[in-house]
C-alpha cells in the first residue's frame, strides 16, 4: 500500500487537478488506484467524470463502512471517494485516512489523498513510508510559505518523505523562471520535476475528464507521466 498526500501550500495551487491526472497516470500500469477527496472546497469527482449534480460523499455518512457506498469508478478504473455535502455526521479526515487500510487489496495499491490547504501537515496521520507533496506555484507568496514550511519541518523532525512540487509553471515568465532556478539551487526538498501550465488541464475539467485522456500528446500528459514514474521510484526505495 502506497500513500501519497497532496496539499496546496495555499489555496488555488491546482492540487485537485494533479491528484486526478496522477491517479489516471498510475492506473495505466494496471494497479489498483484510489483517490480520496478530503477537501470540503474541492471537487475531485468532477475531474473523474462524476455528474455535476452529485452531492453525496463520505462526509454524509456516520462510519466508513457505509461511506464506501460513495466510491465511484472512472473509465480508467480509478476508484474515487468524493467529500460530500459537508454535513460531517461523525467521520473526519483522519479516520477516513486510517480506514482506507481496509481497502488495501494489494501491495501495489496506490492511495492518493487530496488534502485541504488550510489543514496543517502535522495534523495528518503520516507513516514513515508516506510521501507528502506540497504544491507550490512560482510566486512570492509560495516562496515565503515554502521556506517557513521548511523551518517547521526541521523543528518537527518529520519522518515521512516531504517534497515541494511546482505546478502551473510558465516558462515565458521571467519571474517564474528566476524563482524556479532559485528553488532548484537553494530550496531543499524541491521535487526534481515540475508541472507546466497547460490550458488543456482546464479544458479537460470542462468535459469532466483529465488532461492525459483528452490530450495524450500534450505537455501536461508528459508531465504527469513523469511525476508518476518518479513517485514509483520513490515508493520502490521505501520498500527496500
What spans do the regions from the language model cover?
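Walker A/P-loop phosphate-binding motif and the immediately C-terminal alpha-helix
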Residues: 2-40
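P-loop/Walker-type NTP enzyme "switch/lid" segment
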Residues: 9, 32-107, 206
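Conserved beta-strand segments of the P-loop GTPase G domain that flank and frequently precede/overlap
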Residues: 36, 82-83, 112-114, 133-138, ...
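Glycine-rich phosphate-binding loop used to anchor ATP phosphates in small-molecule kinases
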Residues: 103-122
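Inter-motif core of Ras-like GTPase G domains
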Residues: 120-140
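Anionic-ligand binding region
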Residues: 141-162
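Beta-strand-loop-alpha "switch" segments that mediate conformational coupling across diverse proteins
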Residues: 168-174, 180-215, 224
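NTP-binding/hydrolysis catalytic cores, primarily Walker-type P-loop NTPases
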Residues: 211-240
